[in-house]
C-alpha cells in the first residue's frame, strides 16, 4: 500500500504493524452536517476497510468539538442549552453516518471532557512565555 505523506510531499510505501491508529477531526455539532463532512469520513472508512482486508486492526479516533463559539452562538439564537443542541446534532450526524454504512469510530472524545487538560496546557504555555493574553483570549 502507498499513501501520500504530506510532510514529505510524496507518495510513499505504507508498511504498518498489526495495529493502525488514525485520527480525524470531527464535527462541531451546531447544525446539520453536509456532504463535505461525509466525504472526509468516507475516506477514512475506505482506508480502514482496506487495512482490515489486509489483516490489520484499526482504531480511528474522531473528536467532537462540543463547545465552540459557533455552537454557543447558535444555542443562544435558538434559546437552548448548548449541550442539548450538541446532543441533537450528534444524534443526527450518527444517523447520517449509519445511513451511509460507515464504520463507527473507535473513540469519540469530546472537547468538554478535556477542559481541565486544556486549561493546564494554556497555563503551561503562558508560564513558559510561549503564549500571550489579549482581549480575554490566549494566543500561541
Residue ranges and their predicted role:
Residues 1-140:
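NTP-dependent nucleotidyl-transfer catalytic core
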Amino acid at each position: 500500500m502507498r499513501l501520500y505523506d504530506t510532510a514529505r510531499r510524496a507518495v510513499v510505501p505504507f508498511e504498518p504493524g498489526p495495529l493502525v491508529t488514525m485520527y480525524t477531526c470531527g464535527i462541531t455539532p451546531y447544525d446539520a452536517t453536509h456532504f463535505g463532512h461525509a466525504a472526509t469520513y468516507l475516506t477514512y472508512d475506505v482506508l480502514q476497510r482496506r487495512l482490515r482486508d489486509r489483516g490489520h486492526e484499526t482504531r480511528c479516533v474522531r473528536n467532537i468539538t462540543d463547545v465552540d463559539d459557533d455552537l454557543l452562538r447558535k444555542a443562544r439564537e435558538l434559546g437552548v442549552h448548548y449541550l442539548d443542541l450538541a446532543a441533537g446534532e450528534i444524534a443526527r450526524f450518527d444517523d447520517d453516518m449509519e445511513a451511509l454504512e460507515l464504520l463507527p469510530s473507535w473513540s469519540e472524545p469530546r472537547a468538554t471532557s478535556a477542559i481541565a487538560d486544556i486549561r493546564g496546557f494554556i497555563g503551561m504555555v503562558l508560564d513558559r512565555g510561549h503564549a500571550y493574553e489579549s482581549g480575554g483570549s490566549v494566543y500561541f
